[in-house]
């Protein structure tokens, strides 16, 4: 019963991770954030692998899923520090997130709740200047929205990591018990004795 509840909980967590990752992938596509797009794609693939491992009793899949979740937590912690400008990440924002291939930033920069976008009037701006509009009136600035999204990913990943370790341990314990039972049966098995095809007959001595 405990194993079943653990498996069901892990599948539920994986489904929540898929939903959150797909939602994030859509907004990253809209903002042309290529580095997060690649990371989200890998995350979706590994989460699907974790679901398959849970449903088909594959402990190795769950171990791989657990390792990826540790990397995923580190990546999202980096994104939180990045958007909250911890250290010198803000100096290379465009280069890191979109590989410096476009003039876009986060989709939430211009489409956040309550944001009012005003085009910049005046002489043409150089291509290196990405500030083509002014954004005012946002109820929540886009760095905080991105940080909250990453915090949600970390929250789900931590729960997934704990349950994946638990379920994979249950699977490995069951595999070990099956191997032990199989080896015990092999020792207890006795091969049938071969019967001789020679037939003994009484020898009569002539009188």
Curated annotation (Swiss-Prot):
One of its GO terms (cellular component) is plasma membrane. It is found in: Cell membrane. Keywords: Cell membrane, Glycoprotein, Membrane, Transmembrane, Transmembrane helix. It is a multi-pass membrane protein. Its main location: membrane. Glycans are attached at residue 100. The keyword Lipid metabolism does not apply. InterPro entries: Na/K-Atpase_Interacting. Pfam families: NKAIN. The chain crosses the membrane at residues 2-22, 35-55, 62-82, 147-167. Interacts with atp1b1 C-terminus. Belongs to the NKAIN family. This is Sodium/potassium-transporting ATPase subunit beta-1-interacting protein 1.
